[in-house]
């Protein structure tokens, strides 16, 4: 439920702040849609920048006039006011189709990034649509870029957008505005925490992130 998402997200933020985080990036479309307002109200008054992620709908719509754009996301993301407000901004410029993808996150978190089961799932998802008429697909969940190549196989030549790059740019901008941007020339350190805290899940996280 939305209430559970807000509660879990706040617990995650507190966990990271206890370990010295200077800013929070909510790298989850569902958590951003449901909880970002509450997070900003609570933590930005403590001088902690909170950056959310949004589906890359704007570049997908503006790439071609009167295009047909499919937004793949979790059912909860697509049902939230935040997403539908953004959709309303662009609905006169493109035919925007919401595609809920129940179960896709669970496939990815189970390590299923390719194979016949995933292939069949994606085929069923796109079955109701005339693929040749789709101009762009927006990946409205941060899990989905991990299976971008598999999605592309079902839609050869179709542009696929995700919000990761825009979120990275916004994070740099906010850190600069707040005087928190590191002046280090070298790269940072990556630490992975997982709520299940089991080695197989941590290993899967490293594999998914190419670490």
Feature locations, PLM:
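Non-catalytic structural scaffold of enzyme domains
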Residues: 1-211
């Amino acid at each position: 439920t939305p209430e559970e998402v807000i509660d879990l997200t706040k617990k995650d933020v507190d966990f990271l702040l206890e370990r010295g985080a200077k800013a929070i990036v909510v790298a989850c479309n569902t958590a951003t849609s449901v909880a970002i307002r509450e997070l900003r109200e609570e933590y930005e008054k403590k001088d902690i920048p909170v950056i959310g992620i949004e589906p890359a709908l704007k570049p997908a719509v503006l790439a071609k006039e009167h295009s047909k754009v499919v937004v793949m996301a979790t059912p909860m993301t697509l049902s939230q006011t935040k997403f539908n407000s953004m959709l309303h901004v662009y609905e006169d410029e493109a035919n925007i189709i919401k595609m809920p993808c129940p179960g896709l996150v669970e496939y990815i978190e189970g390590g299923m990034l390719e194979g016949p089961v995933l292939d069949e799932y994606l085929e069923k998802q796109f079955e109701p649509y005339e693929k040749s008429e789709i101009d762009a697909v927006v990946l409205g969940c941060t899990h989905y870029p991990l299976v971008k190549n598999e999605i592309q196989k079902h839609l050869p030549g179709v542009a696929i957008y995700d919000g990761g790059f825009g979120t990275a740019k916004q994070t740099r901008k906010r850190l600069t505005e707040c005087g928190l941007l590191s002046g280090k020339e070298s790269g940072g350190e990556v630490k992975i925490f997982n709520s299940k805290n089991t080695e197989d899940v941590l290993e899967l996280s490293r594999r998914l992130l190419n670490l």
